[in-house]
Amino acid sequence: MDTKALEELLGIRAPWRVAGIDVDVALQEVVVRVACERTEWCNTQRRLHVHGWEKRRWRHLDLWQCRTIIEAEVPRLLNPATGRTEMAAVPWAESLSRWSKRFESWAVEVLLHTRSLSDGSRLLRLGWDACDRIMRRAVERGLQRRTLEDVKLVGLDEKSFRQGQDYIALMTDLVGARVLEVVEGAGQKEVEALWQTLPQAQRQAVEAAAMDRGQSMIAGTRAAAPQAAIVHDRYHISAEQNQAVDRVRRAEHKQLMAQGDETLKGTRYHWLSGLEKLSDAAFASFENLVRINLKTSRAWELKTTFESFWVQADAPRGLAFFKKWKNRALRSRLPVFVKLAQSLATSLPELLNYFAYRITNAMSEGFNSVIQQLKAAARGFRSFANYRSRILFFCAKLDLKPSL
């Protein structure tokens, strides 16, 4: 192959040149030896002393179906301003990297498509740890390039980490549809730390944040971003309503079974799922259940009625609707819904903020499926750092690849 063409393929530019090629057929390996024609090195201020030369090797894209290595003697330069030595930059690789820019770029693409370090490792013919380092470098590269000026509406949510009660707190850009950051833990201090990952000017520019009614999320947001309006997420409110319905159903089912009545047996899915998800037979059966004077029927009606709160035209209409719904709940003779109505009333300002911003955490919930796939592919994570790097790599919409 012509030397100039090979230099173009490898990303080698003056003062560097290809000095030779060694091919090991048995190992299926190609080593491209690169030499430097420069003897003097300068920065913007002065000439730098060459303290010594160090042999370095970088993995490159395969040539002729052989594992390809770039090998070069790189000068170690003494910086008189700091008194420290540092390796001279080479055009085909980033600082401190063991791979060429083109190989790292290809590796990032492979990892994005495989979702699994084990599969990526096999395809790239790299070790698991090497693939992990490439992924972490890509995330740090992307975070350094990322701009946050347009982040005005965010979502806060918590996700499970390891088995048990380990959680992470996650912040998403609701307009940009991306994860912004992840921190370990979901207490107030961790939520404050999550907010503080945004630069102060950007943090103060956030207009609203969607979240559940957990006190840690609320207190952390009010401490770190007091100007941001808190909007309670409709899907978490819906989950609270479903939990209330299920508590009523379980208590009533226990009472009925004690009397030999199996009316509610096997009906849990009917009460908690949307009607559109029921089969024709299940829907007909459910219609008959609703006609019976059951406590569970009344609870289900309160839950479904509340869904109309979110389609009100504005906050005043939303307030009027909530007052009517609350009165019905208080008169329902269902202690679970009486307690829920009173609890929601304490969060009314945050519920009404929905009409000003119309934001939900549906996007954060959507990331759940991706995160669960990552956890399944990894068969769990050994550390939070691994978990964070995977989430940001796949969900943060970062510019991950080296500049060629």
Q: Which residues make up each language-model segment?
A:
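Short, conserved DNA-binding cores of transcription-related domains
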Residues: 1-90
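Short, positively charged, Gly/Tyr-enriched micro-motifs
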Residues: 53-165, 204, 210, 223, ...
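Glycine-rich phosphate-binding "P-loop"
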Residues: 90-98, 174-189
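Short, polar/flexible loop-turn hinges at active-site or ligand-entry regions and domain interfaces
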Residues: 92-95, 204, 228, 252-257
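The DNA-recognition helices of helix-turn-helix-type DNA-binding domains
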Residues: 127, 138-142, 213, 228, ...
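Short alpha-helix plus adjacent loop in nuclease-associated cores
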Residues: 237-258
